[in-house]
């Protein structure tokens, strides 16, 4: 399964081989080696266990081998390039080869087989190679011409499903391959894993060890071996190492291996590069050496792990001068307000980097050397006799050693931990004292804490998971399984040092109360309960340990353990108490009313915390995402209502730099969830509900598997305790404030809770109820559509100015008009809303209640749907600064003959009709790039229209008016392009020569765009050498390959590796209000520094061009969609030199890609450099595209597994024929965009898109979260839950619920502060 590049070779250890020696022939003469009878040659086969060095080209290469049919005790070292050796073949890759069907001998089938490639060939094999079919042990020799590469896993489905032996062997190959990819990289994901290392001692073949550290720099592993204590460092490229999977179990239809899910910045970072997604996660054969996310190995006894350290605070950058704000709606920003900054991070935590571990190349007694040393048969040291038995096998983990570089506990200790005075209520500046002051009234005093009722996990006393009142031996506990992920301190990519070598300087170190003799004595005497303020590892051994600390206890270095209490699942959560005998025991857990000012202040709309937001922006944000926030509140209330009254809800306070995630589906936990009181296993509301429903119905729970608890006990839903993260009732109180603020500011609310009543969605309303609500003037809402429930309707007005107008004062319909803008005119007069109340147009949409995730509603179906994005602005519009479109609107309305309103489908129709009606003759004559006259569209912004007037292209990236124009199209879910950015950038920074000079020696993985094969062992310099020079490109079968860099720079390293380029990009990227990390309309910027900030880039995408006619069916990046918005900048276009007629081929590709005439003129007449051909589709058409691809798959005989998706798998590129079929059969037409040098393509969240490079391109993408497209982020997060564990999109890294909450919280704080400054009630 190893795909290699050119003549380079992979690591040899662990591979099967074939050897042919002249000494084994009949007479040793050359004539006896008849190629016609190659199968009869005296081949010897076996397995390579160790090598003298990794350079296979050196003639002194020696390998330690075990021959088949011989005892391992007869292993020996052989010289590969011996004079008597005629050939030496090694396992190479997985292919398809023709053979007779095992079932029907007359039938010829394509069968998966492993090929061998010659390392030495003196026998003249030439094109003949050895092949072993999966499921058979016998080898055959075939011509290479008869072998076909495996392009898609679907080509294997027949052989895998029909033959269980083949299926099992294929799965074993995948597991072996994934293990090797981690081992050979020194991956920190292996920390805690049990491995077996090949022994050269004659008394034993293997010995066991535990991985305690990984070093990606030297690609070695640090291990702990009780048999040979001197063994510390292992190089898997020199000696055979295997990961032990001793907890392989089957859940449903999928096998999962006991391993720990840990996120690694060295391995894909905290957010996997979107470019890497072009390789189908569904096809292991297509990605043979891809570092698949470690969630492939979902643990059984071990869970997910702790987090990556926190990244640098992006707000340290100066905020750019804001462009034009959203429409001024009659309010001003109060002077002298909201200038306080958020609580600052500890500077040392932000700026400290881990020092690389300097591993000495000492030779241990085991005879294992680092790569700097060479192993020979003469100087090989034999293993010593094992002095002890192997340690008890531990559950295998696929774990990153993040504990070595984690921040100290930065979270303030709960006030109840220490007998200190309660904080003054005046310390918090509350935006709404009457409604929020009650939180502080419930702040606990020290006496309250000691007498507080304990949370006994909400289970019966005889429950097997109940830990209260009895001791649990540490050995009986499950190992570490934490999904508290991704701390916010950035770790050096080369870091592999232990915690003792990576101190965080000047960080506040709060000692546990148990380390203070005076406080300890007082607690022992009083028996007062206190909160656990240290990790389980550092507490007495008799207490049950959480899943995280159980694994941490395997670490022998106590210095590494004590600095990481924040990753303990019971840290600041579990309550402890000394009994009358002075023995420490578990007393319970914190309750929601036991918070302090620090804890509650994180979740309240405090004006002192509002930074980087103005009044107009606050109103705009609340208008767009307020309904989604209300839907979140309703969902929380609904989940809370299902909890039995007798069960006490626990409170787990947010821990700084740690992200709570569901142990089952990897979704970020927002608030309510369920926790095991014994091991800390936690599940989200959705997984808990699904599990409980299936248990009640007796159905098999096949979608997700649940990790097991102590002693492999099953986690039963009734034994988990409900737990919330937001303290007190802050969530519901902020929800009340949102309604109050929206009513006072006239912000329209379409949320289901706007009637101030909570209704369950499970019971649809009766027809009589619908009729009554219709008569009352209520209208269907977007929130109801999202939940597919027609019973929740909104009253006509909600307080404030909106409530001042009686229902009977509606204006009659205006005379009919044929103007295409008449429907938009109603946005200011309110006619659209009145018409919606009369027609009830959303009921047909609600019929689709079977699907969990309804497709996005078409823009043409209802103006109610448009209302959320286009007109969810404030009701009172009193001036002319509300947007250029509103200035153009006529007051007349138009109706068709049947009396229904004639509403244009999309905003493009408006502009198109204007241009066609008034400037038809001018448009046909105007030259390329000429702007439309300002007098026509009412604004002076350089721009033009592409894709037949459906794509807005802004020409001045720094124009302050771009803001208004961009937003009007962006609301409609349309992509937008901005040109000319390359004139602003420092071109010297983005040339291939600069990258080659700075990073040419770095080792990277490459992807062959034609086959999606991953190539290892190359350097960055190898890629850049062929960027503009085709003859210098890496070759496959003597043909230059079309390559792209995979995940480079890796993870979040762009800013650290390329600070000058990062600054250059951020200073010149268009529309900084959206695209910058601190942009006021980038909702991700609203997430406090207390939380783990999502990695939104920048990411680099570097790839060669696909020029030939045959390449038009391939994509540089296949069709996929992303959970966030993105701005993709073309910073460099490299045209290969010496290629004839390539310009003509590029033109044909552009024409074949359905580009419009103006785009072609840019290439021919404007002499601009085309970089990439994009095809982008509207998010609302996603479901149609999905159905179309499934249909095509079925036509081609491919399967559609339930846990895979044709779009998320990124296994399709829509060529011309498929695009034509999609348009004819489903009516889906996208945007064909050619991205020239300096163009920035804005892709909306949830919009399917694909990319085909025309020339060699360097692109940089920055992701952001805009208010207009939050709903797509919300839906996609739910979709990704159901993807298989191998998907890079499976894990929720955007934290969309947290982003929505804190964006609304800050907007409310700003509006409340502004309201009080104007003296409003």
From Swiss-Prot:
Pfam families: DUF7030 (PF22989), JmjC (PF02373), PWWP_KDM3B (PF22988), Tudor_KDM3B (PF22987). A motif (LXXLL motif) lies at residues 885-889. GO terms for biological process: androgen receptor signaling pathway; cellular response to leukemia inhibitory factor; formaldehyde biosynthetic process; hormone-mediated signaling pathway; positive regulation of cold-induced thermogenesis; positive regulation of DNA-templated transcription; positive regulation of transcription by RNA polymerase II; regulation of stem cell differentiation. Its cofactor is Fe(2+). The modification Phosphoserine is found at residues 264, 325, 445, 766. Residues 1058-1281 form the JmjC domain. Fe cation binds at residues 1120, 1122, 1249. Gene3D superfamilies: Cupin (2.60.120.650). Residues 316-327 have a biased composition (Polar residues). InterPro entries: DUF7030, JHDM2-like, JmjC_dom, KDM3AB_Tudor, PWWP_KDM3B. Keywords: Acetylation, Activator, Chromatin regulator, Cytoplasm, Differentiation, Dioxygenase, Iron, Metal-binding, Nucleus, Oxidoreductase, Phosphoprotein, Spermatogenesis, Transcription, Transcription regulation, Zinc, Zinc-finger. It is found in: Cytoplasm; Nucleus. Its main location: cytoplasm. It comes from the Eukaryota. Interacts with VRK1. Belongs to the JHDM2 histone demethylase family. This is Lysine-specific demethylase 3A. The lineage of its organism: Eukaryota, Metazoa, Chordata, Craniata, Vertebrata.
């Amino acid at each position: 399964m190893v795909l290699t590049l050119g003549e380079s070779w992979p690591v040899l250890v662990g591979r099967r081989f074939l050897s042919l020696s002249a000494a084994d022939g009949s007479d040793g003469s050359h004539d006896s080696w008849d190629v016609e009878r190659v199968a009869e040659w005296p081949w010897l086969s076996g397995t390579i266990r160790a090598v003298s060095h990794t350079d296979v080209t050196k003639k002194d290469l020696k390998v330690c081998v075990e021959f088949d049919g011989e005892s391992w005790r007869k292993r020996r070292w052989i010289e590969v390039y011996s004079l008597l050796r005629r050939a030496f073949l090694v396992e190479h890759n997985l292919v398809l080869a023709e053979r007779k069907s095992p079932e029907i001998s007359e039938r010829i089938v394509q069968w998966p087989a492993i090929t061998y490639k010659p390392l030495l060939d003196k026998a003249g094999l030439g094109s003949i190679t050895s092949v072993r079919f999966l499921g058979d042990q016998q080898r055959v020799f075939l011509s290479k011409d008869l072998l076909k590469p495996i392009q898609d896993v679907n080509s294997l489905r027949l052989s895998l499903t029909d033959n269980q032996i083949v299926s099992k062997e294929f799965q074993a190959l995948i597991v072996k391959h994934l293990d090797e990819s981690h081992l050979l990289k020194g991956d920190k994901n292996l920390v805690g894993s049990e491995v077996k290392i090949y022994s050269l001692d004659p008394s034993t073949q293997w010995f066991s060890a535990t991985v305690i550290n990984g070093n990606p720099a030297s690609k070695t592993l640090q291990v702990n071996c009780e048999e040979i204590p001197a063994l510390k460092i292992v190089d898997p490229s020199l000696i055979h190492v295997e990961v032990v999977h001793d907890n392989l179990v089957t859940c449903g239809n999928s096998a999962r291996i006991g391993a720990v899910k840990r996120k690694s910045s060295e391995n894909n970072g905290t957010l996997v590069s979107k470019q890497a997604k072009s390789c189908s996660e569904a096809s292991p054969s297509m990605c043979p050496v891809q570092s698949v996310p470690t969630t492939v190995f979902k643990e059984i006894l071990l869970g997910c792990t702790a987090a990556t350290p926190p990244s640098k605070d992006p707000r340290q950058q100066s905020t750019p001068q804001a462009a034009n704000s959203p429409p001024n709606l009659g309010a001003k920003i109060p002077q002298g307000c909201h200038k306080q900054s958020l609580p600052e991070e500890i500077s040392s935590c932000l700026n400290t980097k881990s020092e690389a571990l300097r591993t000495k190349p000492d030779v241990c007694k085991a005879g294992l050397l680092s790569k700097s040393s060479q192993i020979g048969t003469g100087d090989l040291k034999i293993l010593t006799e094992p002095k002890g038995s192997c340690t008890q096998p531990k559950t295998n983990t696929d774990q990153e050693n993040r504990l070595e570089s984690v921040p100290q506990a930065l979270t303030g200790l709960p006030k109840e931990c220490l007998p200190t005075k309660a904080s003054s209520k005046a310390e918090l500046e509350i935006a709404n004292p009457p409604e929020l002051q009650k939180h502080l009234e419930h702040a606990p005093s020290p006496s309250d804490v000691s007498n507080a009722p304990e949370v006994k996990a909400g289970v019966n006393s005889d429950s097997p998971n109940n830990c209260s009142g009895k001791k649990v031996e540490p050995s009986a506990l499950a190992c570490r399984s934490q999904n508290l992920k991704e701390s916010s301190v950035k770790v050096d990519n080369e870091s592999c040092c232990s915690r003792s070598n990576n101190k965080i300087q000047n960080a506040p170190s709060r000692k546990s109360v148990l380390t203070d003799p005076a406080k300890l004595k007082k607690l022992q005497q009083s028996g007062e309960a206190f909160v656990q303020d240290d990790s389980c590892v550092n507490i007495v051994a008799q207490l049950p340990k959480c899943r995280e600390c159980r694994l941490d206890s395997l670490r022998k270095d106590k210095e590494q353990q004590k600095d990481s209490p924040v990753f303990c699942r019971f840290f600041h959560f579990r309550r402890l108490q000394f009994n009358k005998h002075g023995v420490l025991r578990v007393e319970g857990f914190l309750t929601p009313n036991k918070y302090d000012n620090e804890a509650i202040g994180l979740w309240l709309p405090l004006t002192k915390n509002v930074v980087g937001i103005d009044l107009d922006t606050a109103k705009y944000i609340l208008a767009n995402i307020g309904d989604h926030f209300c839907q979140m509140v309703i969902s929380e209330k609904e989940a809370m209502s299902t909890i039995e009254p007798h069960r006490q809800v626990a409170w787990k306070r947010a821990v700084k730099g740690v992200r709570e995630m569901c142990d089952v589906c990897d979704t970020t936990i927002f608030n309510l969830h369920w926790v095991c009181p014994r091991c800390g296993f936690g599940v989200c509301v959705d997984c808990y509900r699904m599990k409980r429903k299936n248990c009640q119905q007796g159905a098999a729970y096949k979608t997700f598997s649940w990790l097991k608890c102590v002693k492999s006990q099953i986690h039963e839903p009734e034994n988990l305790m409900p737990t919330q993260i937001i303290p007190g009732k802050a969530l519901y109180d902020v929800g009340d404030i949102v309604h109050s603020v929206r009513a006072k500011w006239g912000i329209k609310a379409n949320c289901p809770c706007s009637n101030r009543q909570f209704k369950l969605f499970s019971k649809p309303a009766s027809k009589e109820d619908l009729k009554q609500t219709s008569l009352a003037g209520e209208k269907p809402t977007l929130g109801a559509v999202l939940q597919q429930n027609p019973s929740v309707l909104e009253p006509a007005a909600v307080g404030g100015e909106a409530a001042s107008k009686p229902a009977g004062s509606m204006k009659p319909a205006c005379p009919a008009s044929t103007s295409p803008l008449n429907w938009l005119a109603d946005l200011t007069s309110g006619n659209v809303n009145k018409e919606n109340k009369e027609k009830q147009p959303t009921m047909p949409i609600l019929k689709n209640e079977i699907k969990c995730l309804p497709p996005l509603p078409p823009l043409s179906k209802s103006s109610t749907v448009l209302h959320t994005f286009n007109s969810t602005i404030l009701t009172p519009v009193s001036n002319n600064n509300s947007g250029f479109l509103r200035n153009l609107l006529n007051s007349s309305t138009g109706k068709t003959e049947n009396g229904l309103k004639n509403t244009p489908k999309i905003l493009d129709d408006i502009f198109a009709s204007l241009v066609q009606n008034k400037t038809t003759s001018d448009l046909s004559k105007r030259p390329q790039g000429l702007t439309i006259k300002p007098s026509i569209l009412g604004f002076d912004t350089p721009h033009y229209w592409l894709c037949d007037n459906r794509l807005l292209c802004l020409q001045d990236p720094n124009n302050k008016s771009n803001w208004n124009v961009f937003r009007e199209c962006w609301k409609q879910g349309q992509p937008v392009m901005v040109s000319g950015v390359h004139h602003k950038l420092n071109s010297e920074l983005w040339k291939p020569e600069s990258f080659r000079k700075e990073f040419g020696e770095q080792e990277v993985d490459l992807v062959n765009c034609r086959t999606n094969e991953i190539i290892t062992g190359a350097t960055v310099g190898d890629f850049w050498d062929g960027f503009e020079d085709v003859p210098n490109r890496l070759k496959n079968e003597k043909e230059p390959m079309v390559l792209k860099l995979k995940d480079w720079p890796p993870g979040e390293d762009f800013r650290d590796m390329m600070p000058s380029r990062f600054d250059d990009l951020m200073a010149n990227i268009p529309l900084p209000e959206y695209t910058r990390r601190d942009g006021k309309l980038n909702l991700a910027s609203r997430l406090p520094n207390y939380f783990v900030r999502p990695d939104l880039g920048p990411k680099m995408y570097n790839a060669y061009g696909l020029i030939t006619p045959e390449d038009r069916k391939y994509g540089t990046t296949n069709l996929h969609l992303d959970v966030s918005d993105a701005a993709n900048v073309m910073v460099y276009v490299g045209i290969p030199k010496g290629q004839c007629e390539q310009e003509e081929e590029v033109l044909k590709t552009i024409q074949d890609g359905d580009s419009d005439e103006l785009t072609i003129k840019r290439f021919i007449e404007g002499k601009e450099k085309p970089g990439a051909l994009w095809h982008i589709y509207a998010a609302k058409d996603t479901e149609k595209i999905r159905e179309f691809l499934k249909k095509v798959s079925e036509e081609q005989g491919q399967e559609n597994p339930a846990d895979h998706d044709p779009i998320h798998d990124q296994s399709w590129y829509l060529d011309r024929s498929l695009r034509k079929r999609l348009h004819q059969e489903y009516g889906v037409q996208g945007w064909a965009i050619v991205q020239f040098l300096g163009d920035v393509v804005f892709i909306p969240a949830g919009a399917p898109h694909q990319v085909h490079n025309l020339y060699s391109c360097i692109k940089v993408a920055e992701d952001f979260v805009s208010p207009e497209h939050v709903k797509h982020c919300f839906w996609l997060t739910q979709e990704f839950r159901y993807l298989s564990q191998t998907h890079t999109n499976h894990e929720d890294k955007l934290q969309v619920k947290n982003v929505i909450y804190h964006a609304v919280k800050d907007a409310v704080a700003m509006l409340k502060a502004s309201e009080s400054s104007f003296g409003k009630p």
